[in-house]
């Protein structure tokens, strides 16, 4: 059985554009720009954009990740200003998206335009132990390219 997360809609305009999973296999829900008017984001500029949606996950085993929409990034250079947004389970309030225009042209963001996607993910919190060394593994301390190419 899948958990259901209660998401509050703050902007009545979303009534006709509720976030929805596009397919049964979709991981993310699209978030929209809940702005009153068109917003122009200049090259190199970052703007905070309201989504009109409030969330309180309440379960410490869950978090929400805000991710860019691939088409906006590839076609227009519009990505998230913080690259990935993280919504902790104890946050209560409206979600905002930090939108960064890394492109060369001004970008006109229209009201209710899809700007990002949200994925709910499980969270496992780490505990830390002071040690003198690790148990040996085949890989060892190799990193950054140590397993080769191809």
Swiss-Prot record:
Top-rank EC class of the record's enzyme: hydrolase
Keywords (A to Z) from UniProt: Hydrolase, Magnesium, Metal-binding, Nucleotide metabolism
Catalyses which reaction(s): dUTP + H2O = dUMP + diphosphate + H(+)
An example Gene Ontology biological process: dUTP catabolic process
Binding site residues for substrate: 69-71, 82, 86-88
Domain of life where this protein originates: Bacteria
E.C. code: 3.6.1.23
Pathway the protein acts in: Pyrimidine metabolism; dUMP biosynthesis; dUMP from dCTP (dUTP route): step 2/2
GO molecular function: dUTP diphosphatase activity; magnesium ion binding
Family: Belongs to the dUTPase family.
UniProt cross-references to PANTHER family, sorted A to Z: DEOXYURIDINE 5'-TRIPHOSPHATE NUCLEOTIDOHYDROLASE
Main function: This enzyme is involved in nucleotide metabolism: it produces dUMP, the immediate precursor of thymidine nucleotides and it decreases the intracellular concentration of dUTP so that uracil cannot be incorporated into DNA.
Protein name: Deoxyuridine 5'-triphosphate nucleotidohydrolase
Species, as recorded: Chromobacterium violaceum (strain ATCC 12472 / DSM 30191 / JCM 1249 / CCUG 213 / NBRC 12614 / NCIMB 9131 / NCTC 9757 / MK)
């Amino acid at each position: 059985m899948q958990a259901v997360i209660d998401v509050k809609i703050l902007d009545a305009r979303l009534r006709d554009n509720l976030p929805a999973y596009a397919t049964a296999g979709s991981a993310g829900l699209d978030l929209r720009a809940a702005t009153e008017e068109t917003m122009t984001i200049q090259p190199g500029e970052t703007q905070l954009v309201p989504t009109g949606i409030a969330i309180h996950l309440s379960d410490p085993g869950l978090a929400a990740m805000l991710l860019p929409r691939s088409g906006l990034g590839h076609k227009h250079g519009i990505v998230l200003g913080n690259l990935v947004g993280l919504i902790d389970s104890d946050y209560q309030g409206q979600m905002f998206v930090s939108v960064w225009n890394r492109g060369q042209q001004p970008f006109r963001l229209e009201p209710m335009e899809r700007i990002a996607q949200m994925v709910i993910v499980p969270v496992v919190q780490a505990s830390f132990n002071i040690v003198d060394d690790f148990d040996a593994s085949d890989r060892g301390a190799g990193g950054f390219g140590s397993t080769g190419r191809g």
